[in-house]
Amino acid sequence: MPAITCVWSDGRSDTWPNVNGHSRTRSVPSLKPLPHQDSKNLLYRQICGRLLAQHVFGGAGSTQPILNQLCKRLSTGNPNNTNASTVVTAPEKNVVSARHVRPNPKSSKDTLEKQPKYSSQIYLTDSFENYYLASLPTNYQLYQRDSNRENGNGKREFWLYGHPSGRPFRSVNDFLHHLYWLISDLTRNESTCCCVLCSGNMTRVRKNLQKENERMFHECKDDTYTWPSSYRLGEVVWIDINNELIPAIIVARNLINYESNQMDAVKLISDTFVEPYQYHCKQLGNSRYYFDMAAADIEPWSRHPLDLQKQEHLVAHSICQTWNLFGIFQPLEGIDMEEPKFHDENYSIPLTVLPTFGGESNSLDDHFYGIFRGAEKLWINDLCVISTSSLPSVLQKTSFMYISDIYVNEDDIVCFQGSLWTQIDKNALDYNDSADNIDEHKDDLKELPRRLQMVSKLSNTYFRCLHDKSVEYVCPFADVLGRWYEPWFVKGDLNYTSEVKERTSSRLSAVGSENWVDDDFYEYLLSEIDMVSAVVM
């Protein structure tokens, strides 16, 4: 069974109860420590591990099960060898879309019949059942508490001692919030923990804040690591409705999968797993219309020119003139941690620190989870295209930056920090080049985000870091041109622009009268779509 290890603890052994010579009476319950090997201790840790895995590797709409299934397929070398045990199949539903695939009109009838059809196969968290906590955090001890059963009102409980307050956690659910804080919040700031012992009468407020921060954590992980979506929540895009391109904004998405022709192995991998989302889009300039779209019917905003004679284009253009930062967090500097990753049995996830509580700060050197830049949304651990005009000659071949940090420096300038990479078409290399550089390419591939490993496997492309891996470059916000897209998502050239003029407090304030966020909308959305992920603004 895959184990989750808690590498840091705030536990104190001096808070444990003294049970030497202690016996149960009518008024005093008995306390018995349960050692690590005890079956009840293991059961307690299994419950903790299962719930914790849903927080760390799961999340509403998470694509982690899809990633697990694809890795199993690739490892066996047989893409058609599907492990269906992690998939819960729901009744098929049609996706409202102008068209999912643009078939060649010269294609035969047999070819067209092989085009994929969407269904609503929902991936749930069944795969988390086998997780367990390798051991309780250091200096935490589980006790079995038996109250007097002679009058028939007694009961058996399991209390966990070790919290600095000296009070015990009286249930697994109470301890889970503290355990999640121990593992995920590397700031070690107890004011951010929402367990009953740390937060006191602020428990409800902190839990609501944690819920929002956790949703942002999973959205970032899904967008940049687990299995990236083509488009992000809150982005302005073009949608194809009856062969007409209409400006729209993505307000929600839900996880889907569809059954394809099992004989077409390459197509099965690239279609089924590259784009696991359906997008819920709101037409800009007309608040009455929402569309459920497949990724093939959506294009990046930088793909087509504007017609400023049309009102809806003007509305979209005004939003794309704005930018805003969101999700303040504490960097890992100074944190004593050997390897900042969550570990699965077969995979490891980059450990992105949860955002700190509170709104936007006015202090300098703030670090941010992400940024809305014009039409697009960028995260840390993301890929962006930058202007090479200010780079030295040895870096002129830069194709994109792998973002490790977004922060405001002492001059109040937004900066992007990360490594610079180039992409090389394998067909463009001569025989000697490809032979000499193959080992270097393999080393670089290990350091890439999973999405680029996938691109390299499914296309004739190498990715290579242009500098020493211990060095990172800082790029000012003005030199960032936009997101880097996988080659199969872009149907032509992108017209990048660096023209963003107005800073706003949030995406909703930039949207203005086009705001769609209200209780009625999400109540309708949740009733219509399974496993929906609402926009984080």
From Swiss-Prot:
Pfam families reported for this sequence: Clr2 (PF10383), Clr2_transil (PF16761)
Biased amino acid composition, Basic and acidic residues = 107-116
| Listed GO biological process terms | chromatin organization; pericentric heterochromatin formation; rDNA heterochromatin formation; silent mating-type cassette heterochromatin formation; subtelomeric heterochromatin formation
Ranges for region Disordered? 96-116
Q: Which InterPro entries match?
A: Clr2, Clr2_N, Tscrpt-silencing_Clr2_C
Q: Where in the cell is it found?
A: Nucleus; Chromosome, Centromere; Chromosome, Telomere
- Please give the subunit comment from the record: Interacts with clr3.
Q: What is this protein called?
A: Cryptic loci regulator 2
What organism is recorded for this protein? Schizosaccharomyces pombe (strain 972 / ATCC 24843) (Fission yeast)
Instruction: Tell me the gene name.
Output: clr2
